[in-house]
Amino acid sequence: MADCCNSTRRDEFGSSRRQFLARCGMGMGALGLASLLSDEVFAAAQTVGSPAKSTHFPAKAKHVIHIFAAGAPSHIDTWDSKPELTKINGQSLPGQNGVAMASPFKFSPYGQSGIEVSEVFSGIAKHVDDLAIIRSMHTDIPAHDVAQLFMNTGSLRSVKPSIGAWVLYGLGSANENMPGYISLRPDGAANVLNWGSAFLPGDLQATSINTSTPTVEGMIQNIRNEYFNRQEQRRELDLVQKLNAMHSQNLQKDPQLEARIQAFEMAYRMQIEATDAFDLSKEPQNIRTLYGDTPQGRQLLIARRLVERGVRFVQVWAGGWDHHEDIDDRLPASAAEIDTPAAALLTDLKQRGLFDSTLIIWGGEFGRTVTRDRNGNENPGRDHNNEAFSVWLAGGGVKGGTVYGATDPFGAKAIQDKVHIHDLHATILHLLGFDHTKLTYRYNGRDFRLTDNFGEVVKGVLA
């Protein structure tokens, strides 16, 4: 047993749970409370502060896979063809800094819908009849960190729950052995607030997984306890539970510590379920080949396996889109990382009967300028633009083969059927069966919601 337990009886039972756990140095996967709590207690822990697991109206989707293209892809080089920009290439544009830069990439019509898509997304383009492409997105601030938080939490200035936390709050968990909300990232660069729960119960925040390594043990450190078997873990957890009960009787509950203890419980259950979910060697070779043996290929295959196991919201970070220079080379490289895996995901979800119950979202935090941004480099790129960008939806409840909204002839600003971040969030919640104005949580005397006091459902993308 750990050294922290070799103490006097007074210290053992008089210290706070926080002190005990800190001194034990318990890590993710080392402990869990599932071995000593009943299923009823576990269910209660999962639903602390959450509403009944019923939607406001029938849901079209039960799960979400959000492919977040962090860094802000250029809409006019991917989903929003602008032939008029070619006609004025190299010329000054009124109201714009610099000179116009036409897209160096060819656009072609795809599918029965005939929607034009850039050659950099030739794989996803084959599924264009399943996509609803919103070309009139706009946001408030063209700064990466703030805009990413806005896309993921609906808030610019204060710490608010992420959209995945709101979804889990509303729907509840569908698998007691897995977190209901998981964030997959190939590196550790992002702000944790992008998948946090803020003032919602702590167990609603995402479990963040670093997918930079292909092994289960590398992705989820300490998923297996090397020092204690399950019976020994039970004895240690029995002591933790006693301390927990005594502390709860005498002192006010500590929400952060309660969430931590619930995480231990989940960790115990995950030792078997997560090991299976993240083990891609169990997939047939043809499926692994379909996705590709790349970081994004592995991430999206894991995402499908998680949805298959009932995870409500999977956030997939697919960054590298901040192309201030060398856009001719860098943008196709970024697109190539996600094109084949995303196309594979759409194919795979369909063949497994999961497409109609899963909402798939792709998009970044804002768009790019229609003018050149050399940024000290001879090979130009594009600067930030919060007034226009593109997002696409697919899957449950989405009207495929649709283009919604439009930018001006050059792609500088959204001008027709403009869609704000709050509108996108309202639409996502609608597809999951929620009226975004009624999915609320009372905190500090006020009812909060994901969309604040704004947001309209984008009915034009609904099937």
Residue ranges of predicted features:
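Ligand-binding pockets and gating/stacking loops
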Residues: 1-463
